[in-house]
Amino acid sequence: MPSGCGDDADSTGNALRRLPHVRKRIGKRKHLDIYRRLLRVFPSFVALNRLLGGLFPPELQKYRRRLFIEVRLSRRIPDCVLVFLPPDSGSRGIVYCYVIEFKTTYSDADDQSVRWHATHSLQYAEGLRQLKGALVDFDFLRLPRGGGQVWSVVPSLVFFQQKADRPSFYRAFRSGRFDLCTDSVLDYLGRRQDESVAHLLAATRRRLLRAARGKRAALPRARASAVAGGRGGGNARRGLARGRAHGPGAQTVSASGAEGSGSQGTDLLRGSRRARVRGGGAVEPAVRARRRTVAADAATTTVSSAFVVPRDRRGRSFRRPTRSL
């Protein structure tokens, strides 16, 4: 590397290191927030592409995707590596790999600010240097005699304003083509992810799964409580209706009818008692009225049956002779 390039790189790095520590901490938190959101929207190509400002062409929607965060390559540690594999697992089509560097800024970045803004231009130059080093690392993974699968590696820069949800500026540069062994490279990228970030993202993924399970489990509990409340209210209403039907206006019945009504009254009392327990004591006055009605019916029936005198067809009374044993 020429000495001038090295001096420019050192001056750029030193200038960015002189930024306030508060700004650096905010930038790190923003990076972690971007990683979490990537995990959240990764299953949906549309949401993933929207998060990155439309970086990917729509033809990649049918491709299978793999996501790697902060991969430690030999020279650089790119923030994100997104691999798009052909739709058919046995296909020998081109693999598209996006090596992405995220830059967080205090103000919105655009095509002009990355040229003239002091901080934006330094971040842009640093990102170019990092992406160039990542391409050199992929060149080291090239198969010496060919025979592998063609990878199109696309270096990309994405600028996020620190309080924004979508990028303010992105740029995809000319891709480099490499003949690589796909399975070996995917395994290499997976093993070279930063462990601390991987653990943090795994904890985030577990929290998202628990939250989703909690939402699904809360719905059956609400339905069960609603069904139980409906049953208790229905029993209470039925017990109240029965108590009103057998109030003080009930007529005197015969002895056999009194016996049946007594057993029926007992069942009604039991049902009303159960309804009172379930319904919260709303039918207590009806139960007490029903008890008094059943007792009065039994007493009236007993007195009436004691004075019944047998009569013949003409209405004359007679007594049956008793037989001695």
Curated annotation (Swiss-Prot):
Transmembrane segments: none annotated. GO terms for biological process: symbiont-mediated arrest of host cell cycle during G2/M transition. Residues 247-258 have a biased composition (Low complexity). The keyword Repressor does not apply. Keywords: Host cytoplasm, Host G2/M cell cycle arrest by virus, Host Golgi apparatus, Host nucleus, Host-virus interaction, Late protein, Modulation of host cell cycle by virus, Virion. GO terms for cellular component: host cell Golgi apparatus; host cell nucleolus; host cell viral assembly compartment; viral tegument. Induction: Expressed late in the infection cycle. It comes from the Viruses. It is found in: Virion; Host cytoplasm; Host nucleus, Host nucleolus; Host Golgi apparatus. Residues 222-286 are annotated as: Disordered. InterPro entries: Herpes_UL24. Belongs to the herpesviridae UL24 family. May participate in nuclear egress of viral particles. Plays a role in the dispersal of several host nucleolar proteins including NCL/nucleolin and NPM1. Since deletion of host NCL/nucleolin negatively impact on nuclear egress, UL76 supposedly acts on this process through its effect on host nucleoli. Induces cell cycle arrest in host cells at the G2/M phase following by apoptosis. The mechanism involves the inhibition of host mitotic complex cyclinB/CDK1. This is Protein UL76. It comes from Human cytomegalovirus (strain Merlin). The lineage of its organism: Viruses, Duplodnaviria, Heunggongvirae, Peploviricota, Herviviricetes. The gene is UL76.
